[in-house]
Amino acid sequence: MNNYHFQEHHLLLRDQVRRMVEKHVAPIASEIDENNRFPEELVEIFGDMGLLQLWVPEEYGGPGADLTSVCLVKEEIAKVSESAALLAANNSFGLILPILNFGTEEQKRHYLGLSAKGRTLTAVAITEPGTGSDVSSMKTRAVQDGASWVLNGGKIYITFGSVAHFILVFARTSEGKGANGISAFIVDTKTPGFSFGKEDRKMGIRGVPNVPIFFDNVRVPAENMIGPEGQAFKTCMRILDLNRPTVGATAVGLAQGAIDVSTAYARERNQFGRPIAEFQGIQFMLADMQMQTEAARCMLYDCTRMADREEWDGFSAKASMVKCFASDTAMKVTTDAVQIFGGAGYMRDFPVERFMRDAKINQIFEGTNQIQRLVIARHMLHG
């Protein structure tokens, strides 16, 4: 594998994660999918390695990792389990990035300090029954009452919603202002009036709990608002820009994992008296799978280098390109992996059908790939 612009600390981190994955993640990857089980035992392991709190700066007790580090971690873990990869850097979207970019110093010291301990899980609550890509149409309301805000409404498909300690909730705080009337709040899930529903029955990422969540007069201190009132859409877009490359990293890892097992299988599977790897048709499939995945990887780490150097001009479009291209690649590569396995690929005895089921979500969450193409086209046309 090309080492791109990786520095020594990136390579050391990658090697450490690779060893951890072999020891702790690979042995349970199929089981957590089969049993629809959240791998709670990985929380402590990831936390002790600093993988939950990667983006917490050193001044607040964290590793102070950059985007390249986060993506390397996700790529390595996703080679065997996307569910486990989604747990890594769990706090980034729900707590660390919003507070780093928009929080007060008091919020940073409190919440980043908690995250740095490596035991805090978070979630983000944006999507509602009538609100997916159109964030501006959300119905969840927050009404100010003295020194508090009172939340009412509900969200759906909330990743880690049943296990999170804190949830970043987006709610409308003023009427008639479109996206500008939305604010963001950190909600402690122990707060009275907060509840979650039955876990969603999903095609893939079955080791990750997704649930609907509900707010029934949930009272949140005013100091838990992140950023200026009514400006959370800007917060959301900024965080999504930084998070989308991590989806690309997960997709690249998933694709590479599918390639690795397909290559090994093609060497071992015999038909017509020889390994199927000797047939040109299989060789062409494997070559295309690796070319596409390597192209996605090159795009990914070019994007992370931009972020690490704080080169923000054009970054939003590049992040959308990475997310879109890598997830489309993972979907195609994992489908081809199933085809190489033939009938065996359709069976749960082999991981490629799980890889294919897991791959689909990357084309949907963090903004659908249709939305990504809109972002890219608008950048091309309007700059």
Can you say where each PLM-predicted feature lies in the sequence?
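Short Gly/Pro-enriched turn/cap motifs at secondary-structure boundaries
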Residues: S115, G130-S133, Y157-F160, T173-G176, ...
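Alpha-helical interface subdomain recognition
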Residues: M1-V80, A84-N90, F102-Q107, L114-R119, ...
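A short core secondary-structure module
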Residues: S148, N152-F196
